[in-house]
Amino acid sequence: KTTVREMEVLGIEPDTHMLEIARLLHQGAKALQTGFARLKANPLAAERDAAAVRKTERQTEKVYRKAIAELFDPEHYAQALAERRREPGDDLELLLEPMDQAGCSSVAKGLSFVMEALKRREIYRHLSNAADHLAHAGDILHDIVVKTA
């Protein structure tokens, strides 16, 4: 919920990496819920669910690392801008008004790249942290299975 609110405040639309991480988090949460539901009746199945939860965390971290690598790649940023048909600095016009017109374009492009990267990194960190918490819950499920088996 707070991640969605931050995306709204920062004006960030979800990208393919965010959507993939969200899908993995949903998959892990479902496995965790199923594992706790099966804990008493079928501990071996609950252990498989705990392993599935931990696997989704590892998969999420792979997507996160790929997203961060692309995020700080200027060529990837330029391609993404072209796909969205936006000019770097479109959202920074008011900030750059007092600057000399000759220098605005390159400053706007650089500043826009940095601002976009920082905003997206913040969202990626939120999602990665959620995966870490999910994995911790999966570890707890595993510990319960070990102690009760």
What is each of the regions a protein language model found here?
Residues 1-149:
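Cytosolic, long alpha-helical scaffolding segments
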